[in-house]
């Protein structure tokens, strides 16, 4: 986190004069409100590794400790094209790893280091990621050497770990398993601003209205920042209250509490320096807008030195935080508290704080010449650790108990760099910690039931009186919390029976409690997690039989049951759906985006394709899975049977649709063209399958004569995919 805000990032788009783009105006240019169905088709043919490549298998063949040795050697192998500060690249790689992981946000689980997105626009060209293109390029010889045995995503984080270790710092462990993608992720919302932080863009917090004014699911304070503006809110270094507010809110949205925030800030700033010893106007465009000959390098300086070493400019802030910038020491807190500070401007014009009357022994060596002494500095964000009462109390405790600080930093760094990897069962490598951590959403290992045990429980559920609707709703409520973004949620653990999920409005708590109580009494030796999914199998197979088909629904047991003590309630609260198109549910909160767009977002998090989303919506409607007794989209006279009636009746041209007056275009009614009588009611999440051309094309397939059984089989396949989405033990 050493360099947050490059000042001269330049325009991210470069178009030589007189040359048109290949495609011209896109559909989205002509119709900005067009549904972005492309987010459900990510990372397809662009992946050169092919579908058969097994990264976990490749990683297990890696000479892990030889790789670590090579990384350690790189730390002090300074290159003339980008010299190492203090002769050590460690701080540079810490910042690279931090910024790879630091884009994570809890609201939707997106961002983070998991897929190596820092290699692609917009992240490779964010102002806050200035000059990290050089850090990645320094790693290339090592990546080239070890090939597909180590992903870029894993290499970024491991390089950060080795950097800390090589400077005497503490680490808690490392888990591999991050799989690279080969194009920018299409399903992530970074904000609607059209200017970067250094181009006058406003903060996302309205102080008059409170911290919640940051638009969900965003976490960073301004466009192009990982966290906060280190100079202060809106660049105002005098706003102490605002600085602490910004830090607390943005770190909270990235899954960090106050203690973790202090530990990460102080620990990260124990190392290295910020760069602002030059004129930012000399910097060229960011990588995404740089010249072809630059070969992916951005922020190239026209300074006679090339803007490297002594003259490097990144954030604009200049200097080291401590007098020992390549060692893990206690000096960060000592210098922060032992000195009074005055506000100064760096050579690049950025606000920073300098110790008053600093002793020579407390000054830092110049990064380019250890024989020169220069003052240390603190950013406005650092000063918040001293000036904010809550942060100060934690900082003073850490200053007086360095072992506690070491442990807190190591654990916070591990959480920062692994938060988006899901449960520990996904971790690879010899340095995975044994300890289970609550933010990993631990689940006790399950026991796979025998076929006889499964059949016995199926028979009991079938005779219990539970309806198809109840069984389908309960299984969906349990499994559909899964997010492929950070691998949280899902049916394993049966957390639908625990707080907070058991009380979510979307889950119909009273109905849910009755069904769970019944299943608990019938499950025998099966886990509740297995019983819930098996209940869905029973309901679905009945619906299939009643529709006249003979299609089995797969079931693989072996799920475990989490306890309330293993469940961080606050971290799960952010996962409560504001809307769920699969259940035709819209909560009381005013939505920031359209229901049909939230449907795509949910489908994307579930890892569904357009056909999978479409077949699930159509099937769930006729199975009675709507929230409550809502009849919208229930286009069938054969409720509880798995038929294609939803699509047949949606596409029936005898219906004329109109928005219900006063519904703000959220509800619609169909009338018969001939009689004028009401036939159906629908929501936006229903009619979009007849309105949007891509979704209609798929809906037509499922409405065609002869495709009735195809619809059933496709529904079963998509349903099973969701039920097993978090079964990493089956991979």
Curated annotation (Swiss-Prot):
Post-translational modification comment from the UniProt entry: Formation of the three residue Trp-Tyr-Met cross-link is important for the catalase, but not the peroxidase activity of the enzyme.
Active site location: 99 (proton acceptor)
Location in chain, cross-link Tryptophyl-tyrosyl-methioninium (Trp-Tyr) (with M-254): 98-227
Position(s), cross-link Tryptophyl-tyrosyl-methioninium (Tyr-Met) (with W-98): 227-254
Single annotated GO MF: metal ion binding
Bound cofactor: record note: Binds 1 heme b (iron(II)-protoporphyrin IX) group per dimer.
GO cellular component, one term: cytosol
Pfam families: peroxidase
Site feature location: Transition state stabilizer: 95
GO terms classed as biological process: cellular response to hydrogen peroxide; hydrogen peroxide catabolic process
Annotated residues for binding of heme b: 269
InterPro entries: Catalase_peroxidase, Haem_peroxidase, Haem_peroxidase_sf, Peroxidases_AS
EC number(s) on file: 1.11.1.21
Cofactors, names only: heme b
EC primary class: oxidoreductase
Transmembrane feature ranges: none
Known catalytic reactions: H2O2 + AH2 = A + 2 H2O; 2 H2O2 = O2 + 2 H2O
Keyword annotations: Heme, Hydrogen peroxide, Iron, Metal-binding, Oxidoreductase, Peroxidase
Protein's job: Bifunctional enzyme with both catalase and broad-spectrum peroxidase activity.
Family, per entry: Belongs to the peroxidase family. Peroxidase/catalase subfamily.
Cross-referenced PANTHER family: CATALASE-PEROXIDASE (PTHR30555:SF6), HYDROPEROXIDASE I, BIFUNCTIONAL CATALASE-PEROXIDASE (PTHR30555)
Quaternary context: Homodimer or homotetramer.
Protein known as: Catalase-peroxidase
Native source organism of the sequence: Sphingopyxis alaskensis (strain DSM 13593 / LMG 18877 / RB2256) (Sphingomonas alaskensis)
């Amino acid at each position: 986190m050493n360099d947050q805000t490059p000042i001269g990032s330049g325009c991210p788009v470069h178009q030589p004069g007189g040359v048109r783009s290949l495609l011209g105006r896109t559909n989205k240019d002509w119709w900005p409100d067009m549904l972005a169905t492309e987010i459900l088709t990510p990372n397809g043919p662009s992946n050169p590794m092919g579908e058969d490549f097994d990264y976990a298998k490749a990683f297990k063949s890696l000479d892990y400790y030889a790789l670590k040795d090579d990384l350690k050697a790189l730390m002090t192998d300074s290159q003339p094209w980008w010299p190492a500060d203090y002769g050590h690249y460690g701080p540079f790689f810490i910042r690279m790893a931090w910024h790879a992981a630091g884009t994570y946000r809890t609201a939707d689980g997106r961002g983070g280091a998991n897929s190596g997105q820092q290699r692609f626009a917009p992240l490779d060209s964010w102002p806050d990621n200035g000059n990290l293109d050089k850090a990645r390029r320094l790693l290339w010889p090592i990546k080239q050497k070890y090939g597909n045995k180590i992903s870029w995503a894993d290499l970024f984080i491991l390089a950060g770990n080795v950097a800390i270790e090589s400077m005497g710092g503490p680490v808690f462990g490392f888990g591999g398993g991050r799989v690279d993608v080969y194009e920018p992720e299409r399903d992530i919302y970074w904000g609607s601003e059209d200017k970067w932080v250094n181009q006058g863009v406003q903060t996302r917090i309205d102080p008059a209205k409170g911290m919640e004014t940051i638009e969900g699911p965003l976490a960073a304070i301004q466009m192009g920042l990982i966290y906060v503006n280190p100079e202060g809110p809106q660049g105002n270094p005098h706003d102490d209250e605002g600085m602490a507010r910004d830090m607390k809110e943005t770190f909270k949205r990235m899954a960090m509490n106050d203690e973790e925030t202090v530990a990460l800030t102080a620990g990260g700033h124990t190392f290295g320096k910020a760069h602002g010893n030059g004129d930012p106007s000399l910097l060229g465009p960011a990588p995404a807008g740089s010249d072809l000959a630059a070969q992916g390098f951005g922020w190239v300086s026209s300074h006679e030195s090339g803007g490297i070493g002594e003259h490097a400019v990144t954030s604009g802030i200049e200097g080291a935080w401590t007098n020992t910038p390549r060692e893990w020491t206690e000096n960060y807190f000592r210098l922060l508290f032992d000195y009074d500070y005055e506000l100064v401007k760096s050579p690049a014009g950025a606000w920073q704080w300098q110790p008053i009357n600093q002793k020579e022994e407390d000054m830092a060596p110049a990064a380019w010449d250890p024989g020169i002494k220069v003052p240390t500095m603190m950013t406005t964000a650092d000063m918040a650790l001293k000036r904010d009462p809550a942060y100060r109390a934690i900082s003073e405790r850490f200053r007086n108990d360095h072992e506690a600080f070491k442990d807190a930093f190591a654990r916070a760094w591990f959480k920062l760099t692994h938060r988006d990897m899901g449960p520990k069962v996904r971790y690879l490598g010899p340095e995975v910690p044994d300890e289970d951590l609550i933010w990993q959403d631990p689940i006790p290992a399950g026991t796979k039931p025998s076929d006889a045990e499964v059949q016995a429980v199926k028979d009991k559920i079938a005779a219990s009186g539970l309806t198809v609707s109840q069984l389908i709703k309960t299984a969906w409520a349990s499994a559909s919390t899964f997010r492929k973004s950070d691998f949280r949620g899902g049916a394993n653990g049966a957390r639908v029976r625990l707080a907070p999920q058991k009380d979510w409005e979307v889950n119909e708590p009273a109905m849910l409690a009755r069904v769970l109580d019944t299943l608990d009494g019938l499950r025998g030796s099966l886990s509740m997690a297995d019983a819930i999914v098996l209940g869905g199998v029973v309901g679905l197979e009945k619906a299939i039989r009643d529709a006249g088909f003979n299609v089995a629904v797969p079931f693989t047991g072996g799920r475990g049951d989490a306890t309330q003590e293993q469940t961080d309630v606050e971290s799960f609260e952010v996962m409560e759906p504001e809307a769920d198109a699969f259940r035709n549910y819209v909560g009381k909160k005013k939505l920031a985006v359209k229901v049909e767009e939230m449907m795509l977002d949910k489908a994307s998090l579930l890892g569904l394709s357009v056909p999978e989303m479409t077949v699930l919506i159509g099937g769930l409607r006729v199975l009675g899975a709507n929230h409550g007794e809502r009849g919208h989209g229930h286009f069938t006279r054969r409720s509880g049977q798995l038929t294609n009636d939803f699509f047949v009746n949606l596409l029936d041209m005898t219906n004329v649709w109109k928005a219900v007056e006063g519904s703000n275009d959220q509800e619609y009614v169909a009338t018969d063209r001939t009689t004028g009588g009401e036939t159906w009611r629908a929501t936006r999440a229903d009619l979009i399958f007849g309105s949007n051309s891509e979704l209609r094309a798929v809906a037509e397939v499922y409405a065609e004569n002869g495709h009735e059984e195809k619809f059933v089989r496709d529904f079963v396949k998509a349903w099973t995919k969701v039920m097993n989405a978090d079964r990493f033990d089956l991979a």
